[in-house]
Each structure stands twice: as C-alpha cells, then as structure tokens.
Amino acid sequence: MEVITSIKEAKQIVKNWKSHHLSIGYVPTMGFLHDGHLSLVKNAKTQDKVIVSIFVNPMQFGPNEDFSSYPRDLERDIKMCQDNGVDMVFIPDMTQMYLKNFSTYVDMNIITDKLCGAKRPGHFRGVCTVLAKFFNILNPDIVYMGQKDAQQCVVVRHMVDDLNFDLKIQICPIIREEDGLAKSSRNVYLSEEERKASLAISQSIFLAEKLVREGKKNTSKIIQAMQDILEKEKLIKIDYIELVDFNTMDNIENIADNVLGAVAVFVGETRLIDNFLVQGLK
C-alpha cells in the first residue's frame, strides 16, 4: 500500500494506473475510520484499485463547529487501510489543498439550502470544493459515499452532473452499531449517559420507516411520532426532523416514492444525523 502526501505524486500514480486501463474506486474521508468507512472500502474493491483520502477539511466546518477537536488518529487509520486492502492512502496537507490566496469555490443554489445546509451555512460549499479538487487529482471511476450523509450524496451527485465529471457516485447503506446507532466518527464524543440517550435517534428512524412501509401517508403524523420518541430523552435537542423527496430535498406533505426521512439532533454538545430511504413504493 502506498501512503502518499504529495498531489503531484498521487497524480503520477493514478496516471500510471490509468495507462494500464485499471479502474479506480475512491473513498473520501476525514479520517478516524470506523466500520462504516470500511464498508465503503469493501464496495470499492470491486474496482481494480482503491484509494482512500484522509483530509479534515476546514472549509466545511462553521466558526463554532468542531474542526479543531475533530477526532484524529492517522497511524490507526493507515493500519486499517492496509489491513483492508487499500492500494493508496492519500493524505495531503492544508498548504497543498488550499494555496495562499485560494479563492475558487464550488457552490450551488438548490438542494444545499435545506436540511443540514440550512443549519450549517457554507458547509456544502466546502464539501463540493474539496471533492471537486480530489476528483481532479485522483480521477476515480466510482466514488463510494455513505447513505448516512444522504444530502451530501445528492449534492455531490448534482455537482458531478453539472460539471461533467466522468465518474459515478455509488451510495452505500448505513452501517450501525449492534444497538442501532449509526456509525460516526463523532460517536467518540458521547459520554456513557449520552450514548444511551442517543439510541432514541435510530429508534425514531426505525419507527418512521416502518410507518412509511406500512402505507402511512401523512408526513406530519410520522414526524410527530419521531419527535415524541426523541423528546423523551432530556439530553437530546432536536435540530430538525424532515421527510423530503430524496432527489430534490423538498419537503413533502404526503408520502410518495423516493422518500428520505432525515434527523439531526444534539446529544449534549455532539451533533448526530441519521436517516432512512424508501424507494420503490407502489
């Protein structure tokens, strides 16, 4: 496995692979890897070569968010990549990714102003800008992203279409702890009491998905059922609960096909997200 920190060197390796007609699966991460990331790597191994990038991107954090305290363990991440058959770990530093006087950004006027975008202004501009750079550097064939960041998946897919990137976005299922909590690097922030309270998040998601699959149509009643579960936990503060069209992120009044149920909450000081996606309803 190659551990690369230079953009120039990464591009050279990719160029060599492409000259031998090798396909590339790419998993973008901010590090502190967990089983959710490793499931993306497993999916990416259907390609000839697998690249994992590790970069805690300051541009997607707000001024009062957790950039400085975001969990980091590079040595552990590299070992996990090696143990799971990754071909290249790309770890550029800040000065390479954002040169002095950097002033070019990728932004859009739709999709990003809803859900997490409404609560975290500038977040998706940061995500799209850094991923556009990684796509240019690494030239992947398929990019593997987790459904837990469902809005991000839709936003990035939209960017790929708009800017004619020659790649595909593959959305992979949410990976959960045995008790249902969605895997997240931020789970490490939770105290024992907060960790217990956080189970209400997945419980609300599972209930809502069950109601949708049973044919319930009234979104306000489904949202209320989710809210009732979450509000039982005093350590949880709801950021949003939404039922939206998965492609547009527009709110829906009555359940139709392609529905995303999304939740964001604060458990103590830690912001966690979760969702369910139901497609193929008749």
Curated annotation (Swiss-Prot):
Subunit structure, interactors included: Homodimer.
Binding site for (R)-pantoate: 60, 152
Binding residues annotated for ATP, in chain numbering: 30-37, 146-149, 175, 183-186
Gene Ontology CC terms, in alphabetical order: cytosol
PANTHER family: CYTIDYLATE KINASE/PANTOATE-BETA-ALANINE LIGASE (PTHR21299), PANTOATE--BETA-ALANINE LIGASE (PTHR21299:SF1)
Alphabetical UniProt keywords: ATP-binding, Cytoplasm, Ligase, Nucleotide-binding, Pantothenate biosynthesis
Catalytic reaction annotation: (R)-pantoate + beta-alanine + ATP = (R)-pantothenate + AMP + diphosphate + H(+)
Molecular-function annotations in GO: ATP binding; pantoate-beta-alanine ligase activity
Species of the source: Campylobacter jejuni subsp. doylei (strain ATCC BAA-1458 / RM4099 / 269.97)
Name by which UniProt lists this protein: Pantothenate synthetase
Pathway the protein contributes to: Cofactor biosynthesis; (R)-pantothenate biosynthesis; (R)-pantothenate from (R)-pantoate and beta-alanine: step 1/1
Subcellular location field: Cytoplasm
Gene Ontology BP term (one): pantothenate biosynthetic process
CDD domains per UniProt: PanC (cd00560)
E.C. code: 6.3.2.1
